[in-house]
């Protein structure tokens, strides 16, 4: 739908908690890296070890719960070893500095660009980023961050994926099944203005009523492309494999 990740684009991936924002971004980054791209990931919430574990399980098709609890099988270890070899051959650089600023991201990405090239930047996530200023107005801070990142994307000629959390708006919106809209973006004005692409993630199972087994087991992920500066908006349907923290394509598209 978006014709791949376009250079110099600022791409916002947003959703409520537990929608799979980090997993989605890691899947995109990992797929690009396995095709030869050089990726810089800035994780302000999760550690490098946690991200690597997620990527390994997604690539190996191994249940992450078994890895976390130390209950892996011999077959799991073989798959994980193969996945580790594949990932070790990629150019994925993870920076898990807490509270990293836009200025620090700019400096590190410039160095990587000049040293060994750079094809994609992923930042997880917007709320935890610091700005150079000392504004008490969060909307102003968000505006500074998104504008600076858009400038950086153009300067380095690479796409930047920025994760963001949505407000509680979808929780009370029952008429459309709690699907998010752009207005649910926190401090949405600045984000809408600076972003080239805005993707809103939605999983119906998160809002399933207790006891509705079919709804609870629905693994559909809707990627709602709410803004696309250079193309159409639409919804892309994926399958969410929670045990592997992985998304896969699906051939069927369900109307709602």
Name every feature range the model reports, one short phrase each:
Residues 1-4:
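Pre-Walker A adenine-sensing motif
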Residues 6-11, 37:
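Pre-Walker A (Motif I) flank of P-loop NTPase domains
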Residues 15:
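The Walker A (P-loop) glycine that initiates the GxxxxGKT/S ATP-binding motif of P-loop NTPases
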Residues 20:
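Conserved glycine(s) of the Walker
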Residues 23, 27, 31-117, 131, ...:
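Cytosolic-facing regulatory segments adjacent to core modules
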Residues 101-118, 135, 144-157, 169-256:
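C-terminal regions of RecA-like/P-loop NTPase motor modules
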Residues 130-137:
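Conserved ATPase-coupling elements of RecA-like P-loop NTPase cores
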